[in-house]
């Protein structure tokens, strides 16, 4: 098993993906579509990307006391679908130009750029230029399989109870 594997492909492989990325760049926002509709669009895109020849995205893992950082290089023209992160995380774009689409909308960003992602976020990205993206999590864990179990939610939290969602968000 490749840890934190992403589904990725070169965009030039599919006209349909080009249309979806065009929609992403159009700036989908929550008021225009419900979060559920946006999640469905993300999952449909993931299914389409999975049918195409993959681009291997190999993460570099960095550890420091209480912190885990995962850095990836995304080649220009690549569309990448990440996993659902259970907890708030720090994201750093140190190189490149990328459009990021989540259930909260789409935004094109250029390095340098830093943002805190809310919990239970799944991202789709299209790299307009070669891009370096780093996600930082607060954890003392260093075992990659345990990290995946700790940090990644296999499906959108539609099936979680309100109490479980509140607990993931750090509520009482």
Predicted features by range, described:
Residues 85-104:
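Glycine- and acidic-residue-biased ligand/ion/polar-headgroup-sensing regions
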Residues 73, 102-123:
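Short acidic-glycine-tyrosine-enriched beta hairpin
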Residues 1-71, 165-172:
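A short, N-terminal "cap"/entry segment at the start of jelly-roll beta-barrel domains
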Residues 67-85:
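Conserved short histidine dyad/triad with adjacent acidic residue
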Residues 94-95, 111, 129:
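A cytosolic small-molecule/anion-sensing beta-strand core signal
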Residues 128-172:
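Double-stranded beta-helix
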Residues 78, 86-87, 105, 121, ...:
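A generic "binding-loop/recognition-motif" signal
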Residues 80-82, 100-101, 117-118, 122-128, ...:
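Short beta-strand His + acidic residue motifs that chelate non-heme Fe in jelly-roll/DSBH
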């Amino acid at each position: 098993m490749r840890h934190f594997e992403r589904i990725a492909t070169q965009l030039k492989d599919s006209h349909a993906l080009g249309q979806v990325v065009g929609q992403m760049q159009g700036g989908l926002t929550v008021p225009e579509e419900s979060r559920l509709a946006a999640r469905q669009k993300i999952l449909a895109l993931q299914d389409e990307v999975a049918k195409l020849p993959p681009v291997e995205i190999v993460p570099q893992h960095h550890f420091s006391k209480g912190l885990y950082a995962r850095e990836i290089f995304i080649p220009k023209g690549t569309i990448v679908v990440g996993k659902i992160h259970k907890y708030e995380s720090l994201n750093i774009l140190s190189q490149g130009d990328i459009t990021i689409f989540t259930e909260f909308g789409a935004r094109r960003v250029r390095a340098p750029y830093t943002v805190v992602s809310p919990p239970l976020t799944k991202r789709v990205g299209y790299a307009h230029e070669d891009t370096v993206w780093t996600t930082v999590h607060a954890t003392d864990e260093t075992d990659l399989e345990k990290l995946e179990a700790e940090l990644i939610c296999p499906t959108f939290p539609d099936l979680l109870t309100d109490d479980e969602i509140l607990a993931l968000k750090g509520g009482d």
